[in-house]
């Protein structure tokens, strides 16, 4: 399941974030790569311990945890804190699958979901599409600055070469309360249906019943 979430940050907020990020020191992006991925990756990143990157990462996580669509789709349990990358001058990241486990200062994170928050407007660079292969085929993603795409970490994906301009983004992984992607999809569809019926003032008893089904399935499938 691939979900696009528009306007996580406003244009003005993105501009403020970019001013801070652009002023930092960017390094070789292979510090987060596995052995296989490192042969396909050419980009730049901020150091994971950069204080500005850490501060903005906290802001991103807080914003996402307060976003109803993100919470409904991801059922987040634990984040691997956001990192920041930049592509320019032909830089690219060939097809790869993200590492299954990431280590943080607080322990291990199983990467159930990957997310990219775009921080460059699509008309300011050529190339740089996030191409994701999933059960519905190949999808090419290039969103407006401030918008985010969320997708299963099991997906084969790449960032195509940036042939002009500059593509800056935040990327992150998270462990979901529900490990299985198919179960997460069913819960998301059910939750979205409940919200839609609520907005349509559906009969109260039917909403109670559906909400009960949702929570009982979540109770059955969640791992905490």
Curated annotation (Swiss-Prot):
Enzyme Commission identifier(s): 1.14.11.-
MF terms in GO: 2-oxoglutarate-dependent dioxygenase activity; iron ion binding; L-ascorbic acid binding
Matching Pfam families: 2OG-FeII_Oxy_3, PKHD_C
GO biological process: DNA damage response; intracellular iron ion homeostasis
Top-rank EC class of the record's enzyme: oxidoreductase
SUPFAM superfamilies documented for this protein: Clavaminate synthase-like
All residue ranges annotated as the Fe2OG dioxygenase domain in the record: 78-176
Cofactor note: Binds 1 Fe(2+) ion per subunit.
Cofactor: Fe(2+); L-ascorbate
Keyword set, alphabetical order: Dioxygenase, Iron, Metal-binding, Oxidoreductase, Vitamin C
Annotated binding of 2-oxoglutarate, by residue: 167
Superkingdom of this protein's organism: Bacteria
PANTHER family associated with the record: PKHD-TYPE HYDROXYLASE YBIX
Protein name per its UniProtKB record: PKHD-type hydroxylase Shewana3_0717
Native species: Shewanella sp. (strain ANA-3)
């Amino acid at each position: 399941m691939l979900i696009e979430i528009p306007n996580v940050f406003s244009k003005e907020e993105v501009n403020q974030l970019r001013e801070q990020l652009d002023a930092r020191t960017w390094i070789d992006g292979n510090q987060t790569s596995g052995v296989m991925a490192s042969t396909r990756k050419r980009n730049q990143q901020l150091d994971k311990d950069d204080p500005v990157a850490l501060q903005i990462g906290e802001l991103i996580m807080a914003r996402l945890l307060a976003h109803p669509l993100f919470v409904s789709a991801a059922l987040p349990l634990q984040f691997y804190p956001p990192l920041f990358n930049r592509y320019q001058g032909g830089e690219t990241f060939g097809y790869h699958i993200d590492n299954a486990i990431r280590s943080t200062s607080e322990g291990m994170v199983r990467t159930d979901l990957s997310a990219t928050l775009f921080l460059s407007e699509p008309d300011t660079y050529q190339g740089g599409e996030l191409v994701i292969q999933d059960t519905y085929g190949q999808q090419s993603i290039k969103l407006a600055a401030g918008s985010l795409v969320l997708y299963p970490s099991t997906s084969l994906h790449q960032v195509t070469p940036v042939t002009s301009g500059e593509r800056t983004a935040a990327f992150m992984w998270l462990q979901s309360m529900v490990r299985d992607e198919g179960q997460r999809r069913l819960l998301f569809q059910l939750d979205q249906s409940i919200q839609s019926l609520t907005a349509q003032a559906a009969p109260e008893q039917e909403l109670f019943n559906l909400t009960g089904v949702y929570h009982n399935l979540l109770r059955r499938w969640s791992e905490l």
